[in-house]
């Protein structure tokens, strides 16, 4: 069998750089190397691109992915062809956060006409920006919790008015979030005004725009979506926390969360969640993969929280685990995503770019 040429891209100029490397290690150790010839590109914290070709061995130490002994190359040359001299059948970006999950690198792949795994420019950018995403959900009629949003420059000029707006529109606890980050980076749970001001200061270290959301006593439930024009969903899974707030540290360092798959919910609630996940997928014109996150209250009210266009993708993350529960292994999920990338690229070829 002739191997397909795949390039995995990871790292990136983002606060989620280390998460991306962990994801790359997991994917590289699970991808079917009998089917694929795999090259890797590492984007350093400084934005340099480094390439290593024909990865065949298990990645035992994550530090080996830093490519400290390799010189940086020119981006378009690195992406032009694989180690066997042929064009790539697909690029697999494993990038989280700004400069990777926000439509920027997807735009590069589009300009270079490269097939790539995951969401396109519009879906990636709108899913990354929490305010835009919420506005699209609102247009689609999906129920959400109350929120407000403002810019750093607005807060610097009108701090008192904004603090009053939070008091008038929301009740404590509230969650302060950078508008354009994932993995719970820069997010704070605030129970009073002092914590609110500290949380705003923390969030503005990571973004010029933030969102403050109403807190709620509810279960956190997630649904995985996979596909292009005709996506499929999983049964929901639940995040079980040993901490008050599911932050970056508890997600990736402390091991203080576990996953309940499938979630213990009435079947009617589960089906509603799956249907809402499909609506959210369509609302932002997604393709490839999405994880839709919800709140479910004790009386089974459902509120959509967000969609994640590049969800956590380590072997123990919720998204692959949900598909594992549906009978799709981690390795086969990787293969399916590559096939979806090629399918979307073939569909793009049907478009005309000239006028007769």
Curated annotation (Swiss-Prot):
GO cellular component: cytosol
Protein name: D-alanine--D-alanine ligase
Role summary: Cell wall formation.
Taxonomic classification: Bacteria, Bacillati, Bacillota, Bacilli, Bacillales
Pathway per the UniProt entry: Cell wall biogenesis; peptidoglycan biosynthesis
Binding site for Mg(2+) 2: 306, 308
Cofactor note as given: Binds 2 magnesium or manganese ions per subunit.
Entry coiled-coil feature ranges: none
MF terms (GO), sorted A to Z: ATP binding; D-alanine-D-alanine ligase activity; metal ion binding
UniProt keyword terms in alphabetical order: ATP-binding, Cell shape, Cell wall biogenesis/degradation, Cytoplasm, Ligase, Magnesium, Manganese, Metal-binding, Nucleotide-binding, Peptidoglycan synthesis
